[in-house]
């Protein structure tokens, strides 16, 4: 059985997402299928600036940044599924439901984000996301994103 694996390197991710250091939280896309799912990776380094204060002597990736990494993965999936934004359009993180944190993410971890498309209704697209380290769930959530024109 052969699979058609789609990967994206950092150069391609930078073409899709507006985020830059220190807020770009997707290092590589491991696989995706347009309109269905995406698997991406974030390599967690002790050199990340937020570890200075979260927490000194016991660095833990802030949960909100785990969610942001999953949201960025949904953005990549959306762009690969329906195309890049038109001039004057933005893709907003519009909501989150059922967010659960299961275990901490620490420097040296390789966090895998798996996001799946659920549905689009009234301009909102709903995704399910899970983040894993060593095959164990560290976070899961349902996220909503909206594509809209700038005011």
Swiss-Prot record:
Enzyme class, spelled out: lyase
SUPFAM superfamilies: Thioesterase/thiol ester dehydrase-isomerase
Keyword annotations of the record: Cytoplasm, Lipid A biosynthesis, Lipid biosynthesis, Lipid metabolism, Lyase
A Gene Ontology cellular-component term: membrane
InterPro entries xref list: FabA_FabZ (IPR013114), FabZ (IPR010084), HotDog_dom_sf (IPR029069)
GO terms under biological process: fatty acid biosynthetic process; lipid A biosynthetic process
Location(s), subcellular: Cytoplasm
Superkingdom of origin organism: Bacteria
Active site annotation, chain numbering: 54
EC number: 4.2.1.59
One Gene Ontology term of the molecular function aspect: (3R)-hydroxyacyl-[acyl-carrier-protein] dehydratase activity
Catalysed reactions, semicolon-separated: a (3R)-hydroxyacyl-[ACP] = a (2E)-enoyl-[ACP] + H2O
NCBIfam families in UniProt: fabZ, PRK00006.1
Function text: Involved in unsaturated fatty acids biosynthesis. Catalyzes the dehydration of short chain beta-hydroxyacyl-ACPs and long chain saturated and unsaturated beta-hydroxyacyl-ACPs.
Family membership: Belongs to the thioester dehydratase family. FabZ subfamily.
Protein name stated in the entry: 3-hydroxyacyl-[acyl-carrier-protein] dehydratase FabZ
Lineage: Bacteria, Pseudomonadati, Pseudomonadota, Gammaproteobacteria, Enterobacterales
